[in-house]
């Protein structure tokens, strides 16, 4: 049976004095058998020449417990002073062996590593913080390939050290270097502070970090120094104060996990005894108790049973609890008093965040702790307005029958007669006229029962009806530290070995999805009883959670020069780049086209200028546009999408990839396309009105007539003022132009001919006089198309369409309108543009006037 103590506590302390790791490290500059043999030949002058190769073989195949069997004297003799002058690279591991035996500290090892001269470090010019690279995660294959060239250190040799990586290392990517440091127990941070032990500097380091290093006088080393640090550090971080503190923390985590596992065992034993007694007495068994404990899913078996067991999001859970605890008091105040946290005005709460982080579990536990009965509905099953009215509406002002059979003297049953409605997966509901989103938002405004809504995407357009209606409570992905103790408890309970240092990789692989992590452990435990650094890469690759990136993330990733370097191209292949395009193949080409001019290229060919690279990228984008026209044409050549991915996104980005000069901008093409459609519609309307007095098409009207109209309709106001009103109206009547057409014509001009500033120079009295006189006169009207002057809005003129993101269900039949919502389908003449109604009199009506008099006058008008 394996035990977690192999990774924590006493057993780890005994490994500190082992000597097998150091002897293996002697030849670890290149981890090959030849190096080991060569090193053993070098040490053949010592008293025990044949024991060292044997210890190396044992160390490769045995567990850390086997390391204790190696004798200390052989280790001391191998590090005799006569060996040190031989060669610098070969003697360092030998000195490391003696250091490990003499209980050195981490500071002793750091003092032996030469510090970098900060004046010779190349600083990134015009540096801006790169959020994406700072949060980038290394690929498992990348870590395996790059870590293989590093010397292998002792278990937890960097324990107690806080390391910061900055800049570009010569042979190691940022993610791989951080994973290597975490593998040996180091704490890796992004920023430098007084708690930082050492900084590993590379090329193009941040200037602010260099200033911080000088200010705090922190040790700075390069990649070679990082190798020496791993090779020279003793097991368990040595005897320093920081290492001892880290060991105590690991031991405390081990004790907590052990206690929680023991409590789980006791609860299972008590539960099995109760079930056995119930079966003997012939009592009723609940559905959950029928399934044996060993047959349950781990996500159910190890689900939190109280709020203290919820991993992360403590603030969000307490906010939800306070809202629900004060709900009845807020109801008595008619939800008019916000309270201290501002939640007293909301009848409903909206929990939103990524899947698998405990939103539904938190809602259930909060309701149970406060004594509420729970009515849960899956909103994605109750998608339409009809089903929502049938299934949920009647429960909004009802009571729980279960509460009448509970003992009211118990604290948890104080709210037993009340229940809370939990609507899960709200973002899966249908929008539009027949969808349930709008109806559910109405429920949130008038419900007499606490309503908890749960969704993943709060910012979807169809979720806007819930704005200012629900109390928004955001749940975030928990970090590895908040999940670690729970996972270690599960590992102890299920009797398999889980290295605490690989939990970060598990969380990274699943992107903080606790549910997926537990399912991962459940599946792996059937085939192996150990999860450590030897198999974590294979596990991470198999269980990697694929999430479609958003357009901003895709553009930043594609325009990053690192993925086009020699190392980056091996780890992030062409297929991976094309896969980025397919995350959003509608927006990716537009985002690349918008931002490809905002980079500082780092992948230029020798002798190639930035302008030449931009020209090649622009030419390729134009070719991609030709391919897209074929794809979107009537031929529907969707098989050309991979070619379009290369021409429109991958190839242009590869030419100009590097560092972003600013932030990623959203594509302006959408706005410009909408603007062009608007002006095309206005031009078509003006052409339709003026065609009785002109003989040209729309293009000719824009190029030839509109500049003349500008001179005849605008310039007279600047020269003559109010005296030009009559002449301007006369010109408009000659060409059948309306007042709206006058405004539209003035919007068409761009560049030096823009009219915005000129119109502001016209006095306000002239503008108002022009409007009043035009409205007081009758004007010739061109022939209008049928229905073009009357806007829609009646029941007979519009059809209700569901939200474009959802498919209409078979049960989504049209809902008959209520009596009070019935509208007259007859044509409303008040909305006709050509029929004008007299303004209502401003004088106050006398009390003796008949109510029908005004109606008669309105009818005659």
From Swiss-Prot:
Motif (Nuclear localization signal): 830-834, 855-860
GO molecular function: ATP binding; ATP hydrolysis activity; DNA binding; DNA clamp loader activity
Keywords: ATP-binding, Cell cycle, Cell division, DNA replication, DNA-binding, Nucleotide-binding, Nucleus, Phosphoprotein
Biased composition (Basic residues): 836-861
Domain BRCT: 153-243
Effect of residue 427 to H: In cs mutant CDC44-2; causes cell cycle arrest
GO cellular component, one term: nucleus
Outcome reported for the amino acid change (mutating residue 513 to N): In cs mutants CDC44-1/5/8 and CDC44-9; causes cell cycle arrest
Modified residues (Phosphoserine): 40
Family matches, as Pfam families: AAA, AAA_lid_RFC1, BRCT, RFC1
Other comment: Present with 2360 molecules/cell in log phase SD medium.
Membership in a protein family: Belongs to the activator 1 large subunit family.
Cited function: Component of the ATP-dependent clamp loader RFC complex for the POL30/PCNA homotrimer DNA clamp. During a clamp loading circle, the RFC:clamp complex binds to DNA and the recognition of the double-stranded/single-stranded junction stimulates ATP hydrolysis by RFC. The complex presumably provides bipartite ATP sites in which one subunit supplies a catalytic site for hydrolysis of ATP bound to the neighboring subunit. Dissociation of RFC from the clamp leaves the clamp encircling DNA.
Protein name: Replication factor C subunit 1
Organism whose genome encodes this protein: Saccharomyces cerevisiae (strain ATCC 204508 / S288c) (Baker's yeast)
């Amino acid at each position: 049976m394996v035990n977690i103590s192999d990774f924590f506590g006493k057993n780890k302390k005994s490994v500190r004095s082992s000597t097998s790791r150091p002897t293996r490290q002697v030849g670890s500059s290149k981890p090959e058998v030849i190096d080991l043999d060569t090193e053993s030949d070098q040490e053949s002058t010592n008293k025990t020449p044949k024991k060292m190769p044997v210890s190396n073989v044992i160390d490769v195949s045995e567990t850390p417990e086997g390391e204790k069997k190696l004798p200390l004297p052989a280790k001391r003799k191998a590090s005799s002073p006569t060996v040190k002058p031989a060669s610098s690279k070969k003697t360092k591991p030998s000195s490391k062996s003696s250091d490990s035996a003499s209980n050195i500290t981490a500071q002793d090892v750091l003092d032996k590593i030469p510090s970098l001269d900060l004046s010779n470090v190349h600083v990134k010019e015009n540096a801006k913080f790169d959020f994406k690279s700072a949060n980038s995660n290394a690929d498992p294959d990348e870590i395996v390939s790059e870590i293989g060239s590093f010397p292998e250190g002792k278990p937890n040799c960097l324990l107690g050290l806080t390391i910061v990586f900055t800049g570009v290392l010569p042979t190691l990517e940022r993610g791989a270097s951080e994973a290597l440091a975490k593998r040996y127990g180091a704490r890796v941070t992004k920023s430098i502070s007084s708690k930082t032990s050492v900084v590993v500097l590379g090329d193009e380091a941040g200037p602010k970090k260099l200033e911080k290093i000088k200010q705090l006088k922190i040790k700075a080393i390069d990649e070679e120094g990082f190798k020496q640090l791993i090779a020279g550090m003793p097991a368990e971080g040595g005897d320093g104060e920081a290492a001892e503190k880290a060991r105590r923390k690991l031991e405390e985590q081990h004790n907590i996990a052990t206690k929680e596992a023991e409590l789980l065992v006791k609860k299972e034993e008590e539960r099995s005894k109760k079930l056995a007694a119930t079966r003997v007495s012939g009592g009723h068994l609940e559905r959950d108790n029928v399934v044996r404990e060993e047959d349950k899913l781990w996500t159910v078996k190890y689900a939190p049973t109280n709020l203290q067991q919820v991993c992360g999001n403590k603030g969000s859970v307490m906010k939800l609890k306070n809202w629900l605890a004060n709900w009845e008091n807020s109801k008595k105040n008619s939800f008019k008093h916000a309270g201290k946290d501002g939640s007293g005005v909301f009848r409903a709460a909206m929990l939103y965040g990524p899947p698998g982080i405990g939103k539904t579990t938190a809602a259930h536990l909060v309701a149970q702790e406060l004594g509420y009965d729970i009515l849960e509905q899956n909103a994605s099953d109750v998608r339409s307005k009809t089903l929502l009215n049938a299934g949920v509406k009647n429960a909004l002002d009802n009571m729980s029958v279960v509460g009448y059979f509970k003992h009211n003297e118990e604290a948890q049953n104080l709210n037993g007669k009340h229940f809370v409605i939990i609507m899960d997966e709200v973002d899966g509901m249908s929008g539009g006229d027949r969808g349930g989103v709008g109806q559910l938002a109405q429920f949130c405004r008038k419900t007499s029962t606490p309503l908890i809504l749960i969704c993943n995407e709060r910012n979807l357009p169809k979720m806007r009806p819930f704005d200012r209606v629900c109390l928004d409570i955001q749940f975030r992905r928990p970090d590895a530290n908040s999940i670690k103790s729970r996972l270690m408890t599960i590992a102890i309970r299920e009797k398999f070995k889980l290295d605490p240092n690989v939990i970060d990789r598990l969380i990274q692989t699943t992107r903080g999805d606790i549910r997926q992590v537990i399912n991962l452990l459940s599946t792996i435990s059937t085939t192996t009883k150990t999860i450590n650094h030897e198999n974590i890469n294979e596990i991470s690759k198999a269980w990697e959670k694929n999430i479609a990136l958003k357009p901003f993330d895709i553009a930043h990733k594609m325009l990053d020069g690192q993925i086009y370097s020699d190392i980056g191209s091996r780890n992030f292949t062409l297929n991976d780049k094309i896969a980025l395009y397919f995350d959003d193949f509608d927006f990716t080409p537009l985002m690349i086209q918008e931002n490809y001019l905002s980079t500082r290229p780092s992948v230029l060919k020798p002798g190639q200028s930035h302008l030449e690279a931009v020209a090649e990228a622009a030419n390729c984008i134009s070719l991609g546009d030709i391919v897209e026209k074929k794809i979107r044409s009537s031929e529907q050549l969707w098989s050309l999408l991979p070619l379009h991915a290369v021409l429109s996104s991958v190839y242009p980005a590869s030419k100009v990839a590097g560092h972003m000069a600013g932030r990623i901008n959203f594509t302006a093409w959408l706005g410009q396309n909408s603007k062009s459609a608007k002006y095309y519609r206005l031009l078509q309307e003006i052409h339709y009105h003026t065609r009785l007095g002109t003989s040209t098409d729309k293009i000719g009207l824009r190029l030839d007539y509109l500049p003349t109209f500008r001179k005849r309709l605008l310039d007279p106001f600047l020269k003559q003022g109010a005296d030009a009103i009559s002449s301007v109206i006369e010109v408009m009547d000659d060409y059948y132009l309306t007042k709206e057409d006058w405004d539209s014509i003035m919007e068409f001009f761009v560049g030096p001919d823009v009219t915005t500033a000129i119109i502001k120079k016209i006095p306000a009295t002239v503008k108002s006089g022009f409007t009043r006189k035009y409205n007081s006169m009758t004007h010739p009207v061109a022939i209008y198309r049928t229905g073009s002057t009357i806007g829609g809005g009646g029941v007979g003129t519009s059809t209700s369409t569901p939200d474009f993101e959802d498919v209409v269900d078979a049960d989504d039949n049209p809902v008959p309108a209520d009596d009070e919502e019935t509208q007259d389908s007859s044509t409303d003449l008040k909305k006709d543009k050509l029929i004008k109604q007299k303004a209502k009199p401003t004088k106050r009506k006398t009390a003796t006037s008949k109510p029908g008099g005004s109606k008669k006058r309105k009818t005659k008008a």
